[in-house]
Structures are given as structure tokens and as C-alpha cells.
Amino acid sequence: MYCNICKRNDFKNEHGLNIHKAKVHGIRKQHESAHPPRERHTERTATKRSDETKTASRPTASHEGKTHTTNPRGQVHPHTSNDVVRQSAMIVQMEAIQKCPLLGNHFKGPADVHPQRTKTPSGARKPETPKKPHSATKDDHRTKTPGTPHSADTRTPSSTGTDFGGVRPKTPRGARKPDTPKKPHSATKDDHRTKTPGTPHSADTRTPSSTDPFICPICDGKSFKYEGWFIKHMENKHPGCAFGVVAKGREDDKSDQEKRDSWKRREGSVDDRPSSVAPNFADSFNIKTFEKWVTVAEASIIRQKTDTDETIDCMNRFIKMLESTMNGISHFPLKTFKSGSYYDRTKIDYNDEFDFMFFPDMKMEAVFTNCPPGYCKIRKGVTNSKDLDPYLNKDGFLVPGLFKQAMFDLFEKSLSDGTFREGRRTTRQTSKPGSPAYTILYNLGIHGKRPIDVDLVPAIRIECWPKPAKEIKPDWVKKETTERATRCFHAVMKTYPENWPDGDLLWRISFTHAEKELILHANEKEKGCRKDIFRLLKKIKEVMKSRNSNDIDKFCSYHLKMFMLKFFDKEKYFRNEMKVDLLKKAIKKLGESVEHGNIPNYFIPEDNVIVNVLEKERTLIAKELRALLEGNW
């Protein structure tokens, strides 16, 4: 049978022809639908189906309610009546589908046989609307080229000599090559980002320019248009580095390789820890720009927080167990005070050093009469305890030498005690002559961790503020912090360098408790850069020692601490954007003070803390500091 409208002649029965006319031509036979009417479920139809089931052949007898039926092709299918109707309609509809004579694609009717567009290669942008290719005009407006199909292959039948009959063959994947290359994008008045031929749209080809004045000195010249973006980047990616005026408006000339290497050291593994001064770190100070030097120095002193916390936890457990063991052996009660750069948060390197003071838990008094500045005598306070009587002279003063020897013996017994298992990981170190500390090396027992240098210092705690000390009122910390700082002081055993009457009874006044409180909370009122400048000065000191290890010996961090506390009082503001200028001023004043041989004690101004530093060493330090400011370091 054939259709008298489209002359199609592949219909096997009238039912298929009727469906074709209804679907394609919209002609429906009167009183006949495109699909056969569904049987109503009545008693008659139910009886008929039951009879058909009973007479069904044996292979399908097990399928209750199913019959042997044939589709229009004569194929037998054991389906229900409803399934037969659906299956028949689907088969007839499939047979009515048109095929393209060239491409073989299927369509529902002749009207749908139209040229198909080829797939867009992966990664390429698809046009918003299926319009024809564009061409540029003088006004740079995109216009249509009439008569050209919008596809990957822009050839026309006339140009190729082949008539495709309105259908274009598929273009191989990735072979999209227009005859005329596209015109590259050009910048507009709005300064939009542009694209050059062959450059993916996703690539940002901008280079640092005058329109992006904020450039990161660590990320190979990454630029930022706004200062807020730049500051946010420095806080998130490089939290320990200076920002603002340090890197503003300066491109990375990629010559400072040490700067990038020092930053990589921070992100390296915890086990691969650099020493206080890396082997090639001193060479990095040949940078001509002082601001870049600040960035290098700050990046080099950043320490991983996880490593710091782990070390402190181990040391706190060790000291707690040691104190418990010592109190079990000693005939007088002891307490501990934790000091050092770990606890005031000014540590700058991986050379782990801890200082702990052990003092008797009893009332003691200090006498300052006939004592040089910074020294005092100690005697037992009003108490019934006689635990310290063996270490007193006939006048009732505590003899430093006797007390020191007793404490050193107590350290030795406690560390070798069988109940103190951590003592097996310690090794006694030889102390310098006149040093008040019992020095040990403590192995944490962690792979890759170096042994920790621990100073156990015998001391005496006095619950008052020393009379020779001035009344401090720093306006850069809160009043409560000042009150805590001036609540007490300590006395340690350090020999007075000159001949003095009763010199063997002198104790060195230690303001470790006050120093820790002030330095730890230096930024509590103004979230500024006080502690950052102190850390940078400590780094400068370490670099100077590495460059002149044989000539710089006496100058230490304690001298810097006394200088910085006074510097904090003199300068009113310490905002982060002032860091570089304040550091320059601090270096200049420090060089002058060292050259003149005078750094007064912050708490006792009459006490010169660098009196023991030789003139030759002081001259060399002043020379190094001047060279740093001049860019010749």
C-alpha cells in the first residue's frame, strides 16, 4: 500500500497507512483514530480472554493472563492485549520514519529532513543562537553572511564543486579550520580584557602595569588593582610578611631567588628544619632595596605553628614530671617559672632553647643597701622553716654559691632517678664559666626532631617590686598587664664582674617575669608591629653572628630586649604600614647606642647592660648595622 500524498509505498497494511497520514499529513480517517480503540473491561471481554488463555499453547501456559499474539510483521509475542497494542503502534511508527538519502539519519517526516549541524569540538564556545557566521565591519559590529550555513565547514557547494543537496557532511572532530582567520579582539574604551589569536579565553594574559600598582614580591610579580585585595592576599598567603608600603608599586625582577626559597622552607616538611641562619641566607642580604630585605627576613623567621605547639607540649610535660620528681627528693618545696622566647612568642628560628627557673616556695627578702645597680642580697623572710639554713652565712644572708651547688646536685639526682623515665633522654652539657644555668640536651624521641637545649636555672622569687627599679607606666599595654608585670621579680646567681665588698653574696636582679608580660602583650592595645620589629632585630643579630662568628660573642638578645622596651616608650605609633620606617629608625638608634657603649636597663636606668661587651665587638656591630641601612650588606 502507498500514500497518495507523499507517494510512499512501504506500508504493509491499511492501519500503518492511516497512522502515517495522521502523523505526517494530519489527515485522520472519519470514525477511526490513529490507534485501535482499547477494549473495555467487561464481563464479556474477561470471559473471552479467559477462553483464549485456556486454549493457549503449552510453552506459554505458565504465564497466566497472556496470549500468543502476532504483530503486523507476523511475529509471535506472548504479551497481554494492552502490550500488543503498544508494541504494534511503536513498530508501525518506527516503520513510518523517514531516512535521509545521503546521511541515513532518521526523521519523522519529509518536512523534518533538514541539514543537521555538526557537534561543536570539546572546549569550544557554542554560539548563543544558531545564526550564520559573522564578519567584521568598520564599526566592529558582527553581521551575517547570507547564504552560508552556520557550521564548522564554511565551504559552499559552488566553491567545492559539489552539490550536497542542502545537506553538509560531518566535520571530523578538531578539524574546525575556517578559510578566513577570525579577527583578534581589540581593546575598547572600557579596557576589557582582550584575546589574541590562538589564546584560550580562560587565560589571563595581563602583565603588571601602572593600572595594577600593588604587586606581591613573593608570587613572581602577581599584581592587584586595589590595595584591599593585595592586603588580603598577603594576610592569607604570606601571613608573616610585611605588606602595604613594602611591596607597593614594585615588580619582582626575579633576581631574588633566595626570597622564594626561604618562603618554600616554611611550607616544607616539619622534619626538614633549617638552622638559625641558613647556609646561604647571609648572601640574600645583598639586596639593594631595604624593603625587599624586610620581606626576605620576615619570610625566613616564620615557623610552622604545628611544630611549635608540639614542642611546647612535650617540654611542658617534661618540666611537670621533673618538678614532681624534684619535690619528692628535695627537703624544701620548689616551683617553676617558664621563660624565654617560646613563651613570649618572639621565637625566630628552629634552634629549640628553653629556660626554666626553679625557686623555693617560701618567703624571701631582698636587701639593696651597699649593692651595685642591678644586684641585691637575699635573706630568709619571716618563717619558721629551716630548710634553707644550711645555705645561710652567719649574718643570715643566702650564699649564692652554696645554693647553686645544692640545686645542681638536686637536678642531677632527679634526672638520674629511676622513677623519672624521661631523664634517660637527657644529656648533661658543659656550661660556660659563671653561668647560672644547669644545661641539658633533651631528646624528644620524635624522628627528625633535634634535641632541645634546656637551661635549668636556680633562682629566688621575691613577691614585690625592687626598690632600685623605676615605676614603669607603659601606655602601649593595658593597666592590668602592668600590674601583673610589677607583682614580683627574681634573683639569679651571676658573679659581679668587678671587685666588690661582699661580692660573693650578690645576686643578679632578673626582671624575667616583667619582660615576659610586657613583650607577650606588646600589641594588645594597638594591633601594630612592635613584636615584628623585635623579631627582625633578633634576626639581624643572628645574621651578624653568622657572618662574624669569631668576633661577635657577648652581644645577645637580652641587650636587644632592653633597647626595644625603651624604643617602645619613645615612639607613639606602631601601625603596620609604618613597619619599614620604624625598623630603619630602630636600627639607626641601636647602632648609635652600641657604638657609644650604653644600653640602659629598662627597669634600672643606672645599669648599663652592655658594659661587658668589648669595644672591638661593639665597633663591628655598629659597622654592620650602618652597612645594612646603606644597602651594602
From Swiss-Prot:
EC number in record: 2.7.7.-
Reaction(s) catalysed (UniProt annotation): UTP + ATP = 2',3'-cUAMP + 2 diphosphate
Cofactor: Mg(2+); Mn(2+)
GO molecular function: ATP binding; double-stranded DNA binding; metal ion binding; nucleotidyltransferase activity
Enzyme class: transferase
Compositionally biased tracts (Polar residues): 68-80
Keyword annotations from UniProtKB, A to Z: ATP-binding, DNA-binding, Immunity, Innate immunity, Magnesium, Manganese, Metal-binding, Nucleotide-binding, Nucleotidyltransferase, Transferase
Signal peptide region: none
Pfam families: Mab-21, Mab-21_C
UniProt keyword Manganese present: yes
Residues given in the record as Mg(2+) binding sites: 353, 355, 455
Disordered: annotated segments: 23-80, 107-214, 250-276
Compositional bias ranges of the Basic and acidic residues kind: 29-67, 125-143, 176-194, 250-274
Domain of life per record: Eukaryota
InterPro entries assigned: Mab-21-like_nuc_Trfase, Mab-21_HhH/H2TH-like, MAB21L/cGLR, Znf_C2H2_type
UniProt keyword annotation of Protein biosynthesis present: no
An individual GO BP term: innate immune response
Function field: Nucleotidyltransferase that catalyzes the formation of cyclic UMP-AMP (2',3'-cUAMP) from ATP and UTP and plays a key role in innate immunity. Acts as a key sensor of double-stranded DNA (dsDNA), the presence of dsDNA in the cytoplasm being a danger signal that triggers the immune responses. Directly binds dsDNA, activating the nucleotidyltransferase activity, leading to synthesis of 2',3'-cUAMP, a second messenger that binds to and activates Sting, thereby triggering the immune response via activation of the NF-kappa-B transcription factor.
Family per similarity comment: Belongs to the mab-21 family.
Protein name per Swiss-Prot or TrEMBL: Cyclic GMP-AMP synthase-like receptor 1
